[in-house]
From Swiss-Prot:
Role played: Specifically methylates the adenine in position 1618 of 23S rRNA.
Catalytic class of the enzyme: transferase
Keywords associated with the record: Cytoplasm, Methyltransferase, rRNA processing, S-adenosyl-L-methionine, Transferase
Protein name, entry field: Ribosomal RNA large subunit methyltransferase F
Any single Pfam family the record assigns to this protein: Methyltransf_10
NCBIfam families in the record: PRK11727.1
UniProt lineage: Bacteria, Pseudomonadati, Pseudomonadota, Gammaproteobacteria, Enterobacterales
Enzymatic reactions: adenosine(1618) in 23S rRNA + S-adenosyl-L-methionine = N(6)-methyladenosine(1618) in 23S rRNA + S-adenosyl-L-homocysteine + H(+)
Family: Belongs to the methyltransferase superfamily. METTL16/RlmF family.
SUPFAM superfamilies membership: S-adenosyl-L-methionine-dependent methyltransferases
GO function terms (MF aspect): 23S rRNA (adenine(1618)-N(6))-methyltransferase activity
Length: 336
C-alpha cells in the first residue's frame, strides 16, 4: 500500500466507518474502454507519483481526488494517460480544457465500431487510417487514444496558437506521437474545414467536441452549477476556468447547434474526401436542427450513436455522402 508521511489518504480512509461499497465497473462505458473499472489509485500513483499529494479520503471511506480542483483533475489525467496509454509527458496551460478521459475514450471506441460496420465488422487499424480532429486543443486526447488503441494517424486543428504550442510539446516529447499526429492552425475563426484541409487530402473520419455554449455568460453559469453540485459554494472570480477551457473551447456564436450546422455545410465541399464526418452532440435538443441541416445537404447516410457514462447520456452524429458502391470502393482501396 502506498504511504507518505505524516498521514496518507489511504490510512485516513481505512479508519472510516460505514465504508460504502461501490460497483467494480462503471456502467454504460464501451466494452473496450480501459476505464470501465473504478480508478485504481494505487496503480495510478505508482505510474505517476505526482498524483499522491492530490489523493484524499471521501465521506464514504474511499479514495478520490477533488474534482472541483483543476490541478487535481489535471494530475489525474496525467496519471491515466501515462498508466494506460504510455504517455511520458503531458501538460496543458492552466486555462485549457481538461477533458474527462473515459468519455473521450468512448467516442474513439464507438467511432472504431462505426468504421468496422462498413468493413465486415473488422476495425481498420494502422497508419493508413487517417482521422481529422477538429479542435484538438492542448490536450491531444483523441489522437493519444486513437493511436494507442488502433494505430491511427491524426491531423489535429485548432484556432488557438497557444494551445497548439502546448500540443506540439506533447507530440515532441512522446515518440509514439511524433509520426502519427500532425498539427495545423485554423487561422479563420469562422471556418472549420476550409484552410486546414488540402484539396488532395482524404480522411477516413473526422471527429470533434464542439463548443457547447452560445456565450461566455452561459459557460460561466454552467461551471457555477457544476461547482454547486460538487459542494463548492465559493464561486471564483473567473468561474469558467475552474473546470478549464478557453473561450474558443467552451463557447461560440450559435453554440453547439451553430457550430455543427456550419460543419455540416462545409462538409459538402469535402464530400468525396471523407468517409464519415462525425461530431459530438451534448444537447439532445440540438439534434433536430442537425438532422434538418443534413437533409438539406442531401447526406446519403446519417447515424446517431448514443453513449453513456453512468447517468450521463451523450451521443455523436455521423454522416457520409458516399453511396454504398462508393463506400465499398473506399474500403477496398484504403482498408484492405
Amino acid at each position: 500500500m502506498l504511504s507518505y508521511a505524516p498521514e496518507n489518504a489511504y490510512q485516513r480512509a481505512s479508519t472510516m466507518e460505514n465504508k460504502k461499497v461501490f460497483p467494480k465497473e462503471k456502467s454504460g462505458l464501451h466494452p473496450r474502454n480501459r476505464h470501465r473499472s473504478r480508478y485504481d489509485f494505487d496503480a495510478l500513483s505508482v505510474s505517476c507519483p505526482e498524483l499522491i499529494p492530490f489523493l484524499t479520503p471521501t465521506a464514504y471511506g474511499d479514495i478520490s481526488v477533488d474534482f472541483a480542483d483543476p490541478l487535481a483533475v489535471k494530475m489525474l489525467n496525467k496519471a491515466l494517460l501515462k498508466h494506460f496509454y504510455g504517455i511520458e509527458y503531458w501538460d496543458i496551460p492552466a486555462d485549457s480544457l481538461c477533458p474527462p478521459i473515459p468519455g473521450r475514450a468512448d467516442y474513439v471506441h464507438h467511432l472504431a465500431d462505426l468504421l468496422a460496420s462498413c468493413n465486415g465488422e473488422v476495425i481498420p487499424k494502422g497508419k493508413n487510417i487517417a482521422l481529422l480532429d477538429i479542435g484538438v486543443g492542448a490536450n491531444c486526447i483523441y489522437p493519444i487514444i486513437g493511436q494507442r488503441e488502433y494505430g491511427w494517424r491524426f491531423t489535429g486543428t485548432d484556432i488557438d496558437s497557444h494551445a497548439l504550442s502546448a500540443a506540439k510539446m506533447v507530440v515532441s516529447m512522446n515518440p509514439t506521437l511524433k509520426n502519427t499526429l500532425r498539427l495545423k492552425q485554423q487561422k479563420d475563426p469562422h471556418a472549420i474545414f476550409e484552410g486546414v484541409w488540402a484539396v488532395n487530402e482524404r480522411y477516413d473520419a473526422t471527429l470533434c467536441n464542439p463548443p457547447f455554449h452560445g456565450s461566455a455568460e452561459e459557460a460561466a453559469a454552467t461551471t457555477r452549477r457544476k461547482l454547486h453540485k460538487l459542494g463548492k459554494n465559493e464561486v471564483a472570480a473567473k468561474p469558467v476556468q475552474n473546470f478549464g477551457g478557453k473561450n474558443s473551447e467552451l463557447w461560440c456564436e450559435g453554440g453547439e447547434e451553430g457550430f455543427v450546422s456550419r460543419m455540416v455545410a462545409e462538409s459538402v465541399a469535402k464530400a468525396q474526401n471523407c468517409f464519415w464526418f462525425t461530431s459530438l452532440i451534448s444537447k439532445k435538443t440540438t439534434l433536430p436542427a442537425i438532422y434538418h441541416a443534413l437533409r438539406y445537404v442531401k447526406a446519403v447516410e446519417v447515424r446517431t450513436i448514443e453513449m453513456a457514462q453512468g447517468q450521463k447520456v451523450s451521443r455523436f452524429v455521423a454522416w457520409t455522402f458516399l453511396t454504398p458502391e462508393q463506400q465499398a470502393a473506399w474500403v477496398a482501396e484504403r482498408w484492405a
